[in-house]
């Protein structure tokens, strides 16, 4: 599986284009906005966009979902249903943060822990990782040892838990009990900032290391 990271919105959120090399079929994970930038990658690589994946319902991750799904006629998978209130509240979030007008949406498929999603011939595991938001999910591709973790974990930091229904203890448990056991060699794409690995964060991250 190949990928390209496209930082979008004033929050520089890492939208990610993922594709199966065998089929050139692709998904966009967390298209928060700036859709022309994302679609330039799709066109440059000669990809067929087949779905949208969403880690959680915050506007910088999901603000462009409704427009992209409508433009391409493609389904939306994720997050977990416990983030419905965040998605329903995106129009208000857009006013609060000064974003362009954003539409709410209903995913074609709410995801649960243990589900799988496909991109072309590739299969990603779904891991429910509450804490930053109650319905946050992580996508993990075992073959390439790659995880898309949204705002659960960052290089040297962790996701905020001071939002409605955030839970610090749940976040720490998600990282230590659901992500780190996948293996030190797993590289991850966070919602913001540079990539890292679970091994690096387990050793050096001051919030969850040691």
Identify what each model region corresponds to.
Residues 1-45, 138-150:
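Conserved beta-strand hairpin/beta-sheet module of binuclear metal-dependent hydrolase folds
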